[in-house]
């Protein structure tokens, strides 16, 4: 049995659900690989209070399945081609806003999570092809924007 090094393990974590930053008590999770409603439901089930960044190009799947996680959602930030449908999915159930870019989505979600004490989770339930070449590129954009957020005085 050969123990793996961090370098050997790390590539398998890219795009998976993981905490990429804790900023002033708000944790940011990248689950860009979740391209179906089922995957997003599974990811969010482990959280208590989530500001969910969700959307992209729907793969002709039933996005109403996402209502199952509504009790865990503080707010929804809908992005991409499916944003309009997602506002209908959560209408009257969870406050939902539409963001025109990932930057706008992350900045809004960060503010909402700071107020609520929740976590920000990118778990799109959709493909990335409306804005990106693939889910890795979408996840990388999310990470870059999260790390570009201004540090708060209490950040390490």
Where do the language-model regions lie?
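Short beta-strands and strand-loop turn motifs
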Residues: 23, 121-125
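Residue-level signal for inorganic ion chemistry
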Residues: 31, 52, 76, 122, ...
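Single conserved hydrophobic/aromatic residue that forms the stacking wall/gate
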Residues: 1-15, 20
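Glycine/aspartate-rich loop-and-adjacent alpha/beta segment that forms the canonical ThDP
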Residues: 125-151
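Short, active-site-adjacent cap segments at secondary-structure transitions
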Residues: 60, 84-86, 127-131
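Nucleotide phosphate-binding/pyrophosphate-handling subdomain across enzymes
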Residues: 16-73, 88
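C-terminal helical cap/extension that packs against the catalytic core
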Residues: 62-118, 154-156
